[in-house]
Amino acid sequence: MNTFSQVWVFSDTPSRLPELMNGAQALANQINTFVLNDADGAQAIQLGANHVWKLSGKPDERMIEDYAGVMADTIRQHGADGLVLLPNTRRGKLLAAKLGYRLNAAVSNDASAVSVQDGKATVKHMVYGGLAIGEERIATPYAVLTISSGTFDVAQPDASRTGETHTVEWQAPAVAITRTATQARQSNSVDLDKARLVVSVGRGIGSKENIALAEQLCKAIGAELACSRPVAENEKWMEHERYVGISNLMLKPELYLAVGISGQIQHMVGANASQTIFAINKDKNAPIFQYADYGIVGDAVKILPALTAALAR
């Protein structure tokens, strides 16, 4: 048997749902999708859900992962085994841990490939900081997986599809975290997963102010701006949501233009699926040139304005 009898899908990030649904179609005969509102439910049915389970009644101060109890109860009531697919977001991983405990299921995070052999999930994901790919065969009846972005293609909606809708009512867990305050995060995040062209900056750009040069190039060619992990987490020059690498974004654009990025394996794991990689770095021995299809050795601060002017013609 090369499919599960059923799969359960949930995404706290609506933009990740189409990819998870496409994966679900390949892995199971019946697709169940947990959603938070009617709009997401309608989308899930168009993407292939046979049954939609609307999670309802959570107090505003409680967290999404507190639905884990009623989600696990629903899953158990409808089969003695099954596959659970979640995005590898922070909240997705929190929910995965709680579901794993309640279902007595193995949990595998950041899956980059999933298949079914003899009714059991086989999962591949990066290990040793991206230096190798590990393969796990999950032996428990239930398997809970968080999926890396780009693992599956995106499912296309079909308005003619139909499905059944159910309601799952909130039940307060015995132990829970209560939200006491919410502070809006200053962010200009974009959906980089869908970007066709990406300009990504590393610390070789020199300063936060110099990132404006990359932004001008983005405007000239219609690209989105990304960065390396040190730019986001060490220097705090850009938002966390924009960094590319094994522990965050895994991109597959048509063009990935790496500016001042050394090309360490942890970063390239998130970029080497790009159709074309173009590198700009003043160090001719930078590892990035081993991955690049095209490269320029030189100072990015001088090259970017000239490149922008040429491409804007």
Curated annotation (Swiss-Prot):
<dbReference type="InterPro" id="IPR014730">
    <property type="entry name" value="ETF_a/b_N"/>
</dbReference>
<keyword id="KW-0813">Transport</keyword>
<comment type="subunit">
    <text>Heterodimer of FixA and FixB.</text>
</comment>
<dbReference type="InterPro" id="IPR014731">
    <property type="entry name" value="ETF_asu_C"/>
</dbReference>
<dbReference type="Pfam" id="PF00766">
    <property type="entry name" value="ETF_alpha"/>
</dbReference>
<feature type="binding site">
    <location>
        <begin position="255"/>
        <end position="283"/>
    </location>
    <ligand>
        <name>FAD</name>
    </ligand>
</feature>
<dbReference type="InterPro" id="IPR001308">
    <property type="entry name" value="ETF_a/FixB"/>
</dbReference>
<comment type="similarity">
    <text>Belongs to the ETF alpha-subunit/FixB family.</text>
</comment>
<comment type="function">
    <text>Required for anaerobic carnitine reduction. May bring reductant to CaiA.</text>
</comment>
<dbReference type="GO" id="GO:0033539">
    <property type="term" value="P:fatty acid beta-oxidation using acyl-CoA dehydrogenase"/>
</dbReference>
<dbReference type="Pfam" id="PF01012">
    <property type="entry name" value="ETF"/>
</dbReference>
<comment type="pathway">
    <text>Amine and polyamine metabolism; carnitine metabolism.</text>
</comment>
<keyword id="KW-0249">Electron transport</keyword>
<dbReference type="InterPro" id="IPR023461">
    <property type="entry name" value="FixB"/>
</dbReference>
<dbReference type="GO" id="GO:0009437">
    <property type="term" value="P:carnitine metabolic process"/>
</dbReference>
<keyword id="KW-0285">Flavoprotein</keyword>
<dbReference type="InterPro" id="IPR018206">
    <property type="entry name" value="ETF_asu_C_CS"/>
</dbReference>
<dbReference type="GO" id="GO:0050660">
    <property type="term" value="F:flavin adenine dinucleotide binding"/>
</dbReference>
<dbReference type="GO" id="GO:0009055">
    <property type="term" value="F:electron transfer activity"/>
</dbReference>
<keyword id="KW-0274">FAD</keyword>
<dbReference type="InterPro" id="IPR014729">
    <property type="entry name" value="Rossmann-like_a/b/a_fold"/>
</dbReference>
<protein>
    <recommendedName>
        <fullName>Protein FixB</fullName>
    </recommendedName>
</protein>
<dbReference type="InterPro" id="IPR029035">
    <property type="entry name" value="DHS-like_NAD/FAD-binding_dom"/>
</dbReference>
